[in-house]
């Protein structure tokens, strides 16, 4: 099967299918987007990231989260390899849970211009307290089915 060359809006060539070094920070990470061939159809796309990591900006200790990103694509789709690299750029980035979660949602909303987007950040306990952070762009398109994010509230051994 012949390779198909897909050009993205953000760069002449996608990162997909090429060796790429991990970005140093979320600010320098590139998100590739491709035209949505179903832009006139309301549907939901979900990315589940069960092993997201970042650093506490105060202690430098690692923080861990389970992210669920739901979006109703508009004119653009996010290319998943570039999303993976963008999310990996947080591994050495110091920010509070709320900032990481909301920054990811806002960056995706800015780049993709979706009809609707939400992100749930389910952070594992630090200091004995789990933090769940939720952000969305506005009202859900009428008639769009959105399943529950499927992440139970944190329960220790109790």
From Swiss-Prot:
Q: Which GO terms describe its cellular component?
A: cytoplasm
Can you tell which superkingdom this protein's organism belongs to? Bacteria
UniProt-listed Enzyme Commission number(s): 1.7.1.13
Which UniProt keyword terms apply here? Cytoplasm, NADP, Oxidoreductase, Queuosine biosynthesis
**Keyword field contains Cytoplasm:** yes
**Catalytic activity field:** 7-aminomethyl-7-carbaguanine + 2 NADP(+) = 7-cyano-7-deazaguanine + 2 NADPH + 3 H(+)
| Gene3D superfamilies, per database record | 3.30.1130.10
Region (Disordered), start-end ranges: 1-37
- Statement: the UniProt record of this protein carries the keyword ATP-binding: no
Q: In which pathway does it act?
A: tRNA modification; tRNA-queuosine biosynthesis
Tell me the compartments it is located in. Cytoplasm
Query: Which processes are annotated in GO (biological process)?
Result: queuosine biosynthetic process; tRNA modification
Q: Which GO terms describe its molecular function?
A: preQ1 synthase activity
Its principal location?
A: cytoplasm
Comp. bias regions, Basic and acidic residues = 27-37
Binding of substrate, residues: 78-80, 97-98
Q: Where is the active site?
A: 56, 63
PANTHER family attached to this UniProt entry: NADPH-DEPENDENT 7-CYANO-7-DEAZAGUANINE REDUCTASE
Query: What's the stated role of this polypeptide?
Result: Catalyzes the NADPH-dependent reduction of 7-cyano-7-deazaguanine (preQ0) to 7-aminomethyl-7-deazaguanine (preQ1).
Family as reported in the entry's similarity comment = Belongs to the GTP cyclohydrolase I family. QueF type 1 subfamily.
The protein's name? NADPH-dependent 7-cyano-7-deazaguanine reductase
Q: Which gene encodes it?
A: queF
């Amino acid at each position: 099967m012949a390779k198909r060359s897909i050009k993205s809006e953000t760069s002449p060539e996608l990162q997909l299918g090429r060796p790429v070094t991990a970005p140093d920070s979320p600010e320098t990470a590139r998100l590739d987007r491709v035209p949505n061939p179903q832009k006139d159809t309301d549907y939901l796309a979900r990315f589940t990231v069960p092993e997201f990591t970042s650093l506490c900006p105060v202690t430098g200790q690692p923080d861990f989260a389970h992210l669920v990103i739901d979006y109703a694509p508009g004119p653009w789709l996010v290319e998943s390899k570039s999303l993976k690299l963008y999310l990996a750029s947080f591994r050495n980035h110091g920010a509070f849970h709320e900032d990481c979660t909301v920054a990811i949602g806002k960056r995706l909303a800015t780049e993709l211009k979706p009809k609707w987007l939400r992100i749930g950040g389910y952070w594992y306990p630090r200091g004995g307290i789990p933090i769940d952070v939720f952000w969305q762009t506005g009202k859900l398109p009428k008639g769009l089915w959105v399943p529950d994010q499927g992440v139970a509230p944190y329960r220790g051994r109790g």
